């Protein structure tokens, strides 16, 4: 796929996809808890489809109605599930399969198998779950003989480990106490877990390093509206404040969202961006225009996805960007730290990495030619595409379909902003 833009004629309206952080949690919990559910709207991103395939493997019935999914039926332990490259579905499923007492083989993408899983496995092993890892890096797990009374989980590497244990404990017991070790990274994602569980009648309340999880009710059916994804919206909002004199409208977002990445609106506004919620409509849309920005600082430990989107400001906004704790970006879908450094240097930016801080500032203005983006990481591809358009260059995206992991319509939406896209 080839894309090009002139860097100044960006305008239009785009719609963001559903929050896969919410949708995956709700889909998986509905299936494993045998709760009849209607969930949507969905973008049917790769990660959402993986969650749907997992519960289908567990015997649940799925009926698609437009961009909604109806879930019903009885759960049965699957012999095999494929988690693809979805870290969220993989980690949550390990906990839920354990709570259901299943003996299941896991398979998936080799890159996901290489990502850390140890703290979650250790936590579940304390409860009696047995894991045997295969040559492909994924386990066969046996939870037939488990005693799930004492829950301890290290949350210092991934909040998804904590999410998995919260969901497992709520499925196994009416009341559980979970001890969370270490400083939890990306804590805002746990708020999404708490809200998701609340939809199923479960209260997850944190006090210090402990969670108390209590079942309050057992709804026969749940109706769940999935809000738009701020992680995906971030790159469009940054695109707008860097390159749209006429402004762009980003639709589908919830104004009072608990998504941690919703802070992107405040971050950009505090940096001087012309960005605001449209109060004249009822569709919860944001309008943003090209602005002179101040330096932006973002903590990759807390906002890893925002760090990718905001790295573009370091290339095109003179005050630049500071990314704190950038090493966190190395353990995502790819080595994202290396990827954004290479992206910035391609445009002549000054890049400095030391003392747990990555600084990016524009250097000699450069309009590179013959850009080839060979990353398979959805977040990197979207950032690279926006950088190409902002620079007025032309570039070749080698694996454009990979954006389907989170934002299947990304390139169609980009076309709406006067970016030339040639499949």
Each PLM stretch: what is its role?
Residues 1-423:
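Structural preference for solvent-exposed beta-strand-turn elements
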